[in-house]
Structure formats: C-alpha cells, structure tokens
C-alpha cells in the first residue's frame, strides 16, 4: 500500500497531509472537506480537488493543521493537499497544471512577520516618531 506524507506551511500554520489508496475522501482535522466553513475557505480548498479531477478518485487524504489563523491554515492545507496529490500520482502534467494555475498549490509561502525592533517595540518593527519642521 502506497503512502505519501507532505507538509504545507503559511506563516505560523503547519498542515501535514497523508495520502493513501482509497475512495477519494479528503478530511481536514478529521472533518470532511465538504463540511468546512466559511464557504470562501471551502471553495479555496476545493481548487486542487477540482484541478486534479479523476486523478483524485482513488486517493484518501488526511490533513492535520495547527497554528496560525483560519486563512493561514487554509493556505497551508491547500499546499499540503496539492503536494500530496502530485506526489501520489506522480504525473508531471498535473504538476504543470497546478503551477500554471497557482504556484502556492505546490510551493509554501516563505514570508514571515518582521520582528519588532527595540525602543518602540509595541508600535511595530519600523515605527519612528513623526518629525515636525515647524
């Protein structure tokens, strides 16, 4: 039995996906993809599923996601799901399809929040006092 493990990251959210042979079920934190709320999040998570089409009919994917907020978790989950589908099927045309549609389906976003600097630490990383000329 073939099993594939992949990881997707976005800011502080980390999604770990496990793909194995099955009947096309996708579960996120043990909850079916169809029951995800709000609708915007569900639609974004359906993108790799719609693009994959029939390639997903014999794959079960279980995703555990932790950390971050709801949108970061969604992005991390999309990346983990896209990577799992491509790695499990091994089809280059599917990989090209994902990359041409949206690169973040296969590549994690490396950006992180900038650390606050000393002195005006509570105000943010680049806060300066406003200068007055009069």
Curated annotation (Swiss-Prot):
InterPro entries: Ribosomal_Su5_D2-typ_SF (IPR020568), Ribosomal_uS9 (IPR000754), Ribosomal_uS9_archaeal (IPR019958), Ribosomal_uS9_CS (IPR020574), Ribsml_uS5_D2-typ_fold_subgr (IPR014721)
Keyword set includes Hydrolase: no
A GO term from the CC aspect: cytosolic small ribosomal subunit
Source species, domain of life: Archaea
Record key words, sorted: Ribonucleoprotein, Ribosomal protein
Compositionally biased intervals (Basic residues): 118-134
Any GO BP annotation: translation
PROSITE patterns membership: RIBOSOMAL_S9
Annotated family: Belongs to the universal ribosomal protein uS9 family.
PANTHER family registered for this protein in UniProt: RIBOSOMAL PROTEIN S16 (PTHR21569:SF16), RIBOSOMAL PROTEIN S9 (PTHR21569)
Name assigned to this protein: Small ribosomal subunit protein uS9
């Amino acid at each position: 039995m073939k099993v594939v493990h992949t990881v997707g990251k976005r800011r502080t959210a980390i999604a770990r996906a496990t793909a194995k042979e099955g009947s096309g079920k996708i579960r996120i934190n043990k909850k079916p993809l169809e029951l995800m709320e709000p609708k915007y999040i569900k639609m974004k998570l359906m993108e790799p599923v719609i693009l994959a089409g029939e390639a997903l009919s014999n794959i079960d994917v279980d995703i555990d996601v932790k950390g971050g907020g709801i949108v970061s978790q969604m992005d991390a989950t999309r990346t983990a799901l896209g990577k799992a589908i491509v790695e499990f099927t091994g089809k280059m045309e599917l990989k090209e399809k994902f990359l041409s549609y949206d690169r973040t389906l296969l590549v994690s976003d490396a950006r992180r929040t900038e650390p606050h600097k000393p002195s005006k630490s509570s105000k943010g990383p680049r806060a300066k006092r406003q200068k007055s000329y009069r």
